[in-house]
């Protein structure tokens, strides 16, 4: 007991998975947790370093990323300063919106299929591709995200929260800047499609939101 001086504790929310060696492992849902911490009036939130960029998307609250429990104890005892993680949300969001590894413009021919994909992309419709192996279904589907309308900042926040709760965000990731594109196989289970399970998780329908 008495490892930490209690006067600071009620001003901060702390989240993380503590390993036996004292290191902190990343968690799911850092973004919605940070939003709730701000709503509840916390001065700051302390999370594993891998979650810091994700949580720092939320403004008006200090976000600190730490490697281990020792850093947290020394911070609360005034022996170590922690540097808050700062993200220029708008700048980062718009800078990443137009970068795609695969481009729809690379596809030659297939005019009828391309037209169908363009209509689906513009109207936000679902689409199913049926054809013989090697006919270009996967190649076309992988390039569809490059013609989807850009996300708004509000849509990006909604989408990032869902993927955060599902544990789908990569470490050291901020806002999702491109529309999610999901291509489930026809053998997918009902739970995987709609969500649920013993430990409920968002399904493909939720992951495709926006």
Regions found by a protein language model. Give the residues of each.
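Walker A/P-loop
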Residues: 128-173
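Peripheral, non-AAA+ core regions of ATP-driven protein-machinery
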Residues: 1-128, 132-138, 176
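Flexible glycine-/small-residue-rich
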Residues: 16, 65, 183-185, 195
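Conserved alpha-helical scaffold flanking the Walker A/P-loop in AAA+ ATPase domains
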Residues: 118, 174-182, 190-210
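Generic secondary-structure signature for well-ordered alpha-helical cores
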Residues: 3, 77-81, 122-126, 146-149, ...
């Amino acid at each position: 007991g008495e490892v930490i001086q209690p006067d600071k504790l009620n001003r901060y929310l702390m989240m993380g998975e503590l390993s036996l060696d004292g290191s902190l492992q990343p968690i799911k849902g850092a973004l919605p947790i940070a939003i709730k911490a701000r709503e509840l009036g916390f001065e700051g939130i302390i999370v594993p370093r891998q979650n810091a960029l994700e949580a720092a998307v939320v403004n008006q609250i200090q976000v600190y990323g730490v490697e281990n429990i020792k850093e947290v104890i020394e911070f609360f005892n005034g022996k170590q300063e922690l540097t808050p993680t700062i993200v220029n949300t708008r700048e980062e969001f718009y800078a990443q919106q137009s970068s795609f590894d695969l481009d729809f413009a690379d596809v030659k021919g297939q005019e009828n299929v391309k037209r169908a994909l363009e209509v689906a992309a513009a109207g936000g419709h679902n689409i199913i591709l049926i054809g013989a192996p090697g006919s270009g279904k996967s190649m076309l589907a992988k390039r569809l995200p490059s013609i989807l309308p850009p996300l708004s900042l509000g849509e990006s926040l909604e989408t990032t929260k869902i993927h955060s709760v599902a544990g789908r965000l990569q470490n050291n990731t901020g806002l999702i800047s491109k529309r999610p594109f999901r291509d489930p196989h026809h053998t997918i289970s009902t739970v995987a499609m709609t969500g649920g399970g013993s430990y409920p998780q968002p399904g493909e329908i939720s992951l495709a939101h926006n």
